[in-house]
């Protein structure tokens, strides 16, 4: 039987857009916690609260974004609209020094754009393959790894521009990246003719007198304003609770929709994977908050007289993802038909194990800081690289399973639910964890002593927590191996 030897041409436009979206999103993210603490002079508690609220709501909106794509917009249009909104949000963020309202409004616009973009970019990629196409896993790993080109360059470029010019210029550069990606994507429109387009019948149908396109416009205006209020009043946790309840209700409905035992098993597998992904990302998302402030305060960042901007360290994680992801995609492709196929539970155990190893290295770094006043940069880079490598064994596996499910018309919503739990809930938990390192309640001397010990405790606890997750995953793997010893447990099954 002939096997396709190359990826669909359309994937390269999807990958290009993903690269620039990563550049835009992670360029801003690398600056945000530092902007809040160093420029706006927020205390650690306030900065962590706003940062985690933003990162949580970013992953709530994909549920609505997935629904709109499934029912009305189609994946391609949803992705383009989301990219446009994110570009606008980054531009508005540059004006946030003028008034706090601009800060909240800009974050709200980015949240809405991300909701339309993030879940549907994966679904758009899934449309390029048939369900059993052996190139699918390689395509998802390629998307995940190649997208990190943007997140490698972004912290370096945005961090440098911010350091040399201004915070506003750093955020503006992130916006330019998103606009560039959108233009490239539009140039490849002809390669997406076979994908799902806008549902014109649904768009022109009337609901409560008005056509649905009018309600869509109202939603695009009202949603950013509502989210702005949530940031301003610090009500985001309530929105998170409501979204979680709705998400679980939708998940229950999808389970009832399943018509075969195979579909129910596939859905059950996705639920378990999502749970472990949630724990993984609660640990990993320390990179943008507590780890970033730890580097800023306790790591010697000087090379040949030049002090490396803290934001640039965000590139280390992404570089590890890109480099190792290309190799992993090749290994999966080469082993697709044989006994060397990487098992799904083995991937998750390895990912969580690497996360534990990464935080173990950070614990050593923090102990050195406590002993000598600062830690070395190479040790920090090693820890971040190990944590970046770990990501390749989590999200690509889970996303590939979601897009393969045979229940019709639910991939967008399932992706949104996955983003809700592994993104929104995980980021909320990450904020709770990061807050344990806050030093705002102490004077300058006491804060330093308290903070370094707090970092040691938090990093050490995450090390052991991730190891406990590895043990649970290995137990599930062993159970599945014994139960289905005569059937392969390959990722594509």
UniProtKB/Swiss-Prot annotation:
GO terms for biological process: protein transport. SUPFAM superfamilies: MFS general substrate transporter. Its main location: membrane. Pfam families: PTR2. The keyword Chaperone does not apply. It is found in: Cell inner membrane. It is a multi-pass membrane protein. GO terms for molecular function: dipeptide transmembrane transporter activity; peptide:proton symporter activity. Disulfide bonds: none annotated. The chain crosses the membrane at residues 14-34, 49-69, 91-111, 138-158, 167-187, 212-232, 235-255, 267-287, 312-332, 344-364, 379-399, 413-433, 458-478. CDD domains: MFS_DtpA_like (cd17346). It comes from the Bacteria. GO terms for cellular component: plasma membrane. Keywords: Cell inner membrane, Cell membrane, Membrane, Peptide transport, Protein transport, Transmembrane, Transmembrane helix, Transport. HAMAP family: PTR2_DtpD_subfam. Probable proton-dependent permease that transports dipeptides. PANTHER family: PROTON-DEPENDENT OLIGOPEPTIDE FAMILY TRANSPORT PROTEIN, RESISTANCE PROTEIN MDTM, PUTATIVE-RELATED-RELATED. Belongs to the major facilitator superfamily. Proton-dependent oligopeptide transporter (POT/PTR) (TC 2.A.17) family. DtpD subfamily. This is Dipeptide permease D. The gene is dtpD.
